[in-house]
Swiss-Prot record:
Its main location: cytoplasm. Transmembrane segments: none annotated. The gene is metG. GO terms for biological process: methionyl-tRNA aminoacylation. This is Methionine--tRNA ligase.
Amino acid sequence: MEKHFKRTLITTALPYANGPVHIGHLAGVYVPADIYARYLRLKGEEVLMIGGSDEHGVPITLRAKKEGITPQDVVDRYHGIIKKSFEEFGITFDIYSRTTSATHHQMASDFFRTLYDKGEFIEKTSEQYYDEEAKQFLADRYIMGTCPHCGNEKAYGDQCEACGTSLSPTDLIDPKSAISGSKPVMRETKHWYLPLDKWEPFLRKWILEDHKEWKPNVYGQCKSWLDMGLQPRAVSRDLDWGIPVPVEGAEGKVLYVWFDAPIGYISNTKELLPDSWETWWKDPETKMVHFIGKDNIVFHCIVFPSMLKAEGSYNLPENVPANEFLNLEGDKISTSRNWAVWLNEYLVDMPGKQDVLRYVLTANAPETKDNDFTWKDFQARNNNELVAILGNFVNRALVLTDKYFEGKVPVAGELTDYDRQTLKDFADVKENVERLLDTYHFRDAQKEAMNLARIGNKYLADMEPWKLAKTDMPRVATIMNIALQITANLAIAFEPFLPFSMEKLNKMLNVEPLGWNRLGATDLLEAGHQLGKAELLFEKIEDSVIEAQVQKLLDTKKANEEANYKAKPIRENIEFDDFMKLDIRVGTVLECVKVPKADKLLQFRIDDGLEKRTIVSGIAQHYKPEELVGKQVCFIANLAPRKLKGIVSEGMILSAENFDGKLAVITPEKEVKPGSEVK
């Protein structure tokens, strides 16, 4: 039986304040959450959308140590960047706060203390890695090593970013401290644990029986965790940055970030509504929906519900529509590798194009499987869909009305069967979009909204009012009235998806925003209503703009390759006498040309001090022939001649291969006589 609620509380995963927000965050969490919140508000429902920065945890302390500043300096900087970016991008939080706030510290401490006083924790001592040089325990990302699953040598103690596997520090092969680089030792330490196994029977019924409607990826991951059997999970860590564990004997220990962060949803609500926050968290007529990425499923479906159940007075989430991951140009997005499209940079590089990114991220939303963002697809969806379909229809409807009816909505006359079918087709859009949004299928909902523009384009193309204008203006009036009703419907249907563009469209239509209940109506614009000035809703994105973005990524990839470069192992030793057999000389390049039908080969004429010799070298992809004429190069002079592409090569030019595969010809520092020996 379908449940009915008085209000909806939307929570969004708290981004770590150790860097800006990127497109993976947007596609997985914030764009779908904002679409849902805007949709419910359009329906006139009571909604709260809660967000905030996660400002505790090891990634933040590591960045602070790397930059030589305090963790507070780090979170102050990035909280400001993140909050400003969200505002400019149109993410409509009712509050966007932070976990370093006084309200949150008190709320998290009180929550822990309530569970502690009720005897809901297990206190036990265990062995954990300890850095003797830095004199501290190594939690999570304070320890690095080789991933046992994929062999990545830079896996963290909580996760391997290369393969995405969740890890424990003891899983790592050849672990090292991320602080000192030293090999850690095992040392005993005391912590508090939440016994998840105690709540396993409840979770099995609540999820596996009562919430079979959850997305398959969410339901399936929860089932896997439950089938493996839940174990007690530590709620504290040996760190000096975070919320201190509020009990005696817990000096030097803070609340583990996974325990601390979700309480941020509660504390942020309390910060916004100090007198009525409990209505949103404890009234069973409130529906709570968590928007998260797949890496947070276990925390929001297993751990946080166990915490709430242990406390005893809170609602549990009604749905957790987690998304999979968005990749970038075929590679996993990574903050540490700077492999991302950062929102704050996008807003500078692409001014006024918030809706283009919202549209593309929704069209490529990783709702059921990992998906990929490419700049070429971004350009294609803008030019071929937003410009050519939606923008084209809106522009034609408004421009033709201005041309034939002085910008006033004309009176519709007698309808044809085709008119009636068109009206029926767009009247059905409301039910379709609504059904998809209610079930968190945002990608398909946006596609259905775009179908409305396709209906409009087809209608105008089939009716050809520009031809009828010469003979039948009453018929043109009917056609344009219907086209304008479709346009006004588009302003409603797309508002959750493209809010900036729909604000612009409402100005062009000269109307106030209409409610969701009016979607599908055929009388949104009255006859005689004066329209505003027609403008282009979207603009074409040129190749040069996309090429600049692709180049940024290529530069990042090159920087990563350089940072991760490892020289090849030294080959086995040879005898000194064997080396002395090589006759390495310096020669001057007299001529250099490309070898026909050979992409990699250059043919050299070289003065070796005794005669002129020919050498063929495979460096054509690294140098233009004219760049080498007149230069001096080192070459092996006594290599046996051999034929390459029919040319006898009398030696080998020496070059060094860089980390990126580029070759650099070896030359003497100062000019020497041709034929000089290299010793």
